Amino acid sequence: REQVNMSQRMRYVYPKSAKSGIAQALWRSWGIVRDLKKDGVSLYHGLSGELPIGIRKSGIKSVVTIHDLIFMRHPEYYNPIDVMMYRAKFHLTCREADRIIAISRRTAEDIVELGGVNPKRIDIIYQSCGVRFANVVSEEAADETRRRYNLPERFVLNVGTIEERK
């Protein structure tokens, strides 16, 4: 929440009755469209590569951000049932979305190739980080940090996961 600069026209909406993980997943896939229409939402942005079923028929415009298609390029890293679900959601999303945001040129190419999407529906918007991470520290502070953590003069910091697919 702290990453979003809220305006008076924005608000967070959560499922009222979906307390369990399964119920929340069902709400995100089916129930949310009813709530969006009831609340007069005119634009929905799916941030995690999927859109709710029926969003196009609802008349609500939609945008989806797709980060990658690893589950299609390397299904061996996933449970086969997950791959089936992700594929189904991906193809539905490709049909339903008014616009698609790809986070890289490679992802955009994959969406065209694997999803049959017209490239004119895709915008490439590279990810970045907030300005609070752009602070340049003094040489003394950097030296102190290297000493504290016993780091060499030059090193690569990876804040990713140790999963093989990443």
Ranges and model annotations:
Residues 1-166:
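Carbohydrate transferase catalytic cores enriched for Leloir-type hexosyltransferases
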